[in-house]
Amino acid sequence: MDKIVIEGGVPLRGSVDVSGAKNAALPVIAAALLAEGEHEVRNVPDLADVRTLGKLLGHMGCEVARGEGDRRTVRLRVPAAVAPEAPYELVKTMRASVLVLGPLLARLGRARVSLPGGCAIGARPIDQHLKALTALGAEIRLEHGYVNASVPRGRLRGTVFTFDAQTVTGTENVMMAAALADGETVLRNCAREPEVKDLGDALVAMGALVEGAGTDEIWIEGVPSLRPLSHAVIPDRIEAGTFLVAGALPGNDVTVRGCVAAHQEALVEKLRAVGAEVTKVEGGLRVVGDGRPRPVDVRTAPHPGFPTDMQAQLMVLLCLADGTSRITETVFENRFMHVQELIRLGAHVEVDGRVAMVKGVPELSGAPVMASDLRASAALVLAGLAASGTTEVLRVYHLDRGYERIEEKLAPLGARIRRVRG
C-alpha cells in the first residue's frame, strides 16, 4: 500500500495549477447517460473516483476513454440500449455512483443501483434523492442493499419538491431526472454549490431547459430528448483551497493558478483573519503566510458558507496559531477523525461532539500518521509540510480519490515529498 513521505519544515515558494473539479466532473459524466451518442467532457482530473465511474458506465455498455494526447478529456459513446444496473462491486467505493440513478430512470424508466459507499464521515443517507424521485413518479423499493426503481407511466412527470435538507448529489440527481420528465419541475431548498451550477450549465448545453442552478430554487422544463454533451468542468475549489492553506502556513508564499476567486470567498475571509496575505493575481490567488497565525472561530455550512471539505485543512493552520480556535462542524457528524492523527504530530485539540477546540502550539513534529478519509488525508499532508522532521502518511488511497498526484504538484514548490509504492 502506498504512503506519502514528507521531510517537513521547508518553506514553499512558487505556483501550482488546479485540476478540474472531481465533484463537478462526476455528475457531468453521469449526465451523459441522458443522451445516446458521443460525448466529450474536458478538464477532467485523473482520479480514482473518476476511473470508478468510468468502469461503472463501461459495465452499463458505454465506451469510456481518455483523449489521445489530452488526458484531461474524457470521451464517452453512449449506446441506445444501456444496462440499467450499478452493482455493489463498483458502487461500494464511491458515494457519487448514486448519480446514475436519476439519468437511468429518466431515459430508460428503470434502474437497479446499489446503495453507495465512499468516505466514512457520517451517515449521509440518500433518502432525499428517493423522496424527490418518488415525487416525480418513480416507484422505489429497497431490497438486498439495492435501490430498485421504475417508472410505471413510462416517463417521469414534473412536480414541485422541497428538499428537507440541502444535498448536493440529491439536487444533481433530481435535476438530471427532471430534464427528461413531462412538464415543469420546481426544486426548492436546493444545494447552491458551484458544482451544481456547473451541472446546470452542462445540461443546458445538452438542450435541457434549466434555470436557477446554483441558487436555492431551480426550475426545469422537461424536454423529449437531449443531445450529446460537450462541456469543460470548473476548477476544483477544494484542491485550490488546500493549496491556499498551504500558502498560509508560516513562511510560505504560494500562487494558486486556475482557481476561481468567487468560489473561495469563505476560505479567503478566514485566511485573512488568521493574518495571511491573500491577493488576486492574473489567473488565480497568491497567499503569503506571514508569521504565526492568529486564532479564529470557524463554523462549517453549506455553500456559500465555509465548506466542510476544508475544515480539516484549516484545522492544521489553526494548530499553529497563537491562541485557541473553535471549529464547529454542522454539515457532517463524525468528521473529526483526523484529530487523533494531528495529536500524534504534537497538536493540542479537544473534541466535544461537533465542536473542536484547537489550542495552538509553536510547532508540530513529524510522525507516522494514518488517513481516515479524503480531506483528512490532505490535512495530514499539510501538517507534514509544516512539521519538523519526517512524516509518513499511510492509507493514501483516500488521498488519490480527490487529489491528482498531490506530491508532484507540491514538490516544485520546494516541498520534500515523495510517494513510496507499497
Curated annotation (Swiss-Prot):
One GO CC annotation: cytoplasm
Catalyzed reaction equations: phosphoenolpyruvate + UDP-N-acetyl-alpha-D-glucosamine = UDP-N-acetyl-3-O-(1-carboxyvinyl)-alpha-D-glucosamine + phosphate
Entry EC number(s): 2.5.1.7
Subcellular location(s) of the protein: Cytoplasm
Binding site for phosphoenolpyruvate: K22, N23
Record's keyword annotation contains Zinc: no
Molecular function via GO: UDP-N-acetylglucosamine 1-carboxyvinyltransferase activity
Pfam families: EPSP_synthase
Entry annotation: catalytic residues: C119 (proton donor)
UniProt pathway: Cell wall biogenesis; peptidoglycan biosynthesis
Positions carrying 2-(S-cysteinyl)pyruvic acid O-phosphothioketal: C119
Binding, UDP-N-acetyl-alpha-D-glucosamine: R95, R124, P125, I126, D127, Q128, D309, V331
UniProt keywords, alphabetically: Cell cycle, Cell division, Cell shape, Cell wall biogenesis/degradation, Cytoplasm, Peptidoglycan synthesis, Pyruvate, Transferase
GO biological process, one term: UDP-N-acetylgalactosamine biosynthetic process
InterPro entries: Enolpyruvate_Tfrase_dom (IPR001986), Enolpyruvate_Tfrase_sf (IPR036968), MurA_subfamily (IPR050068), RNA3'P_cycl/enolpyr_Trfase_a/b (IPR013792), UDP_GlcNAc_COvinyl_MurA (IPR005750)
Gene3D superfamilies hit by this protein: Enolpyruvate transferase domain
Family: Belongs to the EPSP synthase family. MurA subfamily.
Functional note: Cell wall formation. Adds enolpyruvyl to UDP-N-acetylglucosamine.
Protein name: UDP-N-acetylglucosamine 1-carboxyvinyltransferase
Native source organism of the sequence: Anaeromyxobacter dehalogenans (strain 2CP-1 / ATCC BAA-258)
Gene that this sequence comes from: murA
